[in-house]
């Protein structure tokens, strides 16, 4: 008898399951003591991400601790600009820093070689797939072009205003940068699928505060182009798009980007999720990560509410944003147990 596909892949294929599959963004990270110990052994964060042994271990740590249905490869969205030739480093307490943005032509010249420079991520995926149980799905990911471009332009990880202003003042230059990132990102995702990723996710962390025309130009169009390129390369694994902060424009995104799954943030209404499900889309989300951190009866009530409002359609239980570093492990265990019905030690 053949083994059925993992629950997560069945949901992305449009199935309504007896319970939603579950995984959390940033489930591997500083909320886990074993992660903090592992991270202390690396000289810096970029080296940590590009060490397949360490990155594979970080990916697997939450899978050993919790009965999650999906493992997301441990990496970072800023590996793409690094591979394209822009300096990237992380400073303690300050987050990412980036060097001067190279000329567009210089970036374009590096696209073909960029995937090879990220081969360590492929090795990480292969290592994880070899150890991960067959009923648990392995997820690859990349930052979406606009989000990555904001870091490349701002050269840090805080404000977005300068990048948004650049989108208005220099539309042709931004479009050229996004085109480079579309090509590099599609190649990177294809590599991840070939290395063992069974689903792929595009993180558009900064889809908020964009007018309708700009949203179409710098979010919808690049995402659709990436999906087209990935499919043209023969990759058939499901893709999840995450236009975080898009609000009502999530439906514009759904109309324009042919992804199998759409991740929702905490703004998403029950009705929005149900409309997407009725269109045959799998939705993912959307527990508030702050509520996960705070815990208590309100957490239980919200989990139950989400199960009731979206449980009758294809849905993956997740957060609206990543696990916060100071989230108590017992709160994560509590939610996972409540959703899966499995005890968590």
From Swiss-Prot:
NCBIfam families for this protein: hemE (TIGR01464)
Its job: Catalyzes the decarboxylation of four acetate groups of uroporphyrinogen-III to yield coproporphyrinogen-III.
Pathway, per record: Porphyrin-containing compound metabolism; protoporphyrin-IX biosynthesis; coproporphyrinogen-III from 5-aminolevulinate: step 4/4
Identification of the protein by name: Uroporphyrinogen decarboxylase
Binding sites annotated in the UniProt record for substrate: 26-30, 76, 151, 205, 321
Xref: PANTHER family: METHYLTETRAHYDROFOLATE:HOMOCYSTEINE METHYLTRANSFERASE RELATED, UROPORPHYRINOGEN DECARBOXYLASE
Gene coding for it: hemE
Organism: Phenylobacterium zucineum (strain HLK1)
Coiled-coil residue windows: none
Lineage, top ranks: Bacteria, Pseudomonadati, Pseudomonadota, Alphaproteobacteria, Caulobacterales
């Amino acid at each position: 008898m053949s083994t059925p596909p993992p629950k997560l892949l069945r949901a992305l294929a449009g199935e309504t399951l007896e319970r939603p599959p579950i995984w959390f963004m940033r489930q591997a990270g500083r909320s886990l003591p074993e992660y903090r110990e592992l991270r202390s052994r690396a000289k810096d964060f970029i080296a940590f991400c590009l060490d397949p042994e360490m990155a594979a271990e970080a990916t697997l740590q939450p899978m050993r601790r919790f009965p999650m249905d999906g493992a997301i490869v441990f990496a970072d969205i800023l590996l793409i600009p690094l591979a394209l030739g822009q300096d990237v480093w992380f400073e303690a307490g300050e987050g990412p820093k980036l060097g001067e943005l190279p000329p567009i032509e210089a970036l374009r010249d590096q696209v073909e070689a960029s995937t090879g420079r990220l081969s360590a991520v492929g090795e990480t995926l292969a290592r994880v797939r070899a150890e991960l149980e067959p009923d648990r799905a392995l997820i690859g990911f990349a930052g979406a072009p606009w989000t990555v471009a904001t870091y490349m332009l701002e050269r840090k990880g805080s404000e977005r205003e300068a990048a948004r202003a650049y989108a208005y003042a220099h539309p042709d230059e931004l479009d050229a940068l996004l085109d480079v990132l579309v090509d590099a990102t599609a190649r990177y995702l294809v590599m991840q699928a070939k290395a063992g990723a069974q689903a792929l996710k595009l993180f558009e962390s900064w889809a908020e505060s964009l007018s309708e025309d700009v949203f179409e130009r710098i979010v919808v169009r690049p995402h659709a182009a990436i999906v087209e390129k990935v499919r043209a390369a023969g990759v058939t694994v499901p893709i999840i798009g995450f236009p975080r902060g898009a609000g009502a424009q999530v439906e514009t995104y759904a109309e324009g980007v042919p992804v199998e799954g759409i991740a929702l943030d905490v703004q998403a209404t029950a009705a929005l999720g149900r409309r997407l499900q009725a269109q045959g889309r799998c939705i993912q989300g959307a527990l508030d990560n702050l509520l996960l951190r705070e815990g208590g009866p309100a957490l239980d009530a919200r989990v139950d509410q989400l199960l009731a409002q979206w449980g009758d359609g294809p849905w993956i239980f997740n957060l609206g944003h990543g696990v916060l570093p100071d989230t108590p492990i017992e709160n994560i265990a509590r939610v996972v147990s409540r959703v899966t019905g499995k005890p968590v030690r």
